[in-house]
From Swiss-Prot:
InterPro entries: Ribosomal_uL22, Ribosomal_uL22_bac/chlpt-type, Ribosomal_uL22_bac/org-type, Ribosomal_uL22_CS, Ribosomal_uL22_sf. This protein binds specifically to 23S rRNA. The globular domain of the protein is located near the polypeptide exit tunnel on the outside of the subunit, while an extended beta-hairpin is found that lines the wall of the exit tunnel in the center of the 70S ribosome. This is Large ribosomal subunit protein uL22c. It comes from Lactuca sativa. Keywords: Chloroplast, Plastid, Ribonucleoprotein, Ribosomal protein, RNA-binding, rRNA-binding. Belongs to the universal ribosomal protein uL22 family. HAMAP family: Ribosomal_uL22_B. It is found in: Plastid, Chloroplast. GO terms for molecular function: rRNA binding; structural constituent of ribosome. Part of the 50S ribosomal subunit. One of its GO terms (cellular component) is chloroplast. GO terms for biological process: translation.
């Protein structure tokens, strides 16, 4: 039996003050890309969400190099997700002594990086190969349908 080697590290950013919808717009562009390509994309995109995501990707790469000793060239973003956080509620004073509620959304961003140079070992003794029983093919016969002889659409008077 062989042990499974850990090849994934993650970085988690919680309570980031921006909408989850705006952060997902950036996350969808970097999912599945390499580390160096991701940094270039995040530096050149004109969105406000890029900076906290850039910091998380950089932190996940630092976790990978410190915990696993992996090289940054071999890192790929295997999973990136954005979840909605709590909504911070504030009051804005308005005219004639009134106040309006302001809702400031937050989000939680998770970046999971995988080292593609490390192989995962699988125990081959526990895998059993089984064949599915072959099913008999059903033969269908086609019959000619005559719509004029049994009261079709033109038989009405």
């Amino acid at each position: 039996m062989l042990n499974k080697r850990t090849t994934e590290v993650y970085a988690l950013g919680q309570h980031i003050s921006m909408s989850a919808h705006k952060a997902r717009r950036v996350i969808d562009q970097i999912r599945g890309r390499s580390y160096e390509e991701t940094l270039m994309i995040l530096e050149l995109m004109p969105y406000r969400a890029c900076y906290p995501i850039f910091k998380l990707v950089y932190s996940a790469a630092a976790n990978a190099s410190f915990n696993m000793g992996s090289n940054e060239v071999n890192l790929v973003i295997s999973k990136a997700e954005v979840n909605e956080g709590t909504i911070v509620k504030r009051l804005k004073p308005r005219a004639r002594g009134r106040s309006f509620a302001i809702q400031k959304p937050t989000c939680h961003i998770t970046i999971v990086m995988k080292d593609i140079s490390l192989d995962e070992y699988i125990d081959t003794d526990s895998i059993t190969w089984s064949q599915k029983p072959k099913s008999k093919k059903k033969h269908t016969t086609m019959s000619y349908y005559d719509m004029y002889s049994n009261g079709g659409t033109w038989d009405k008077k």
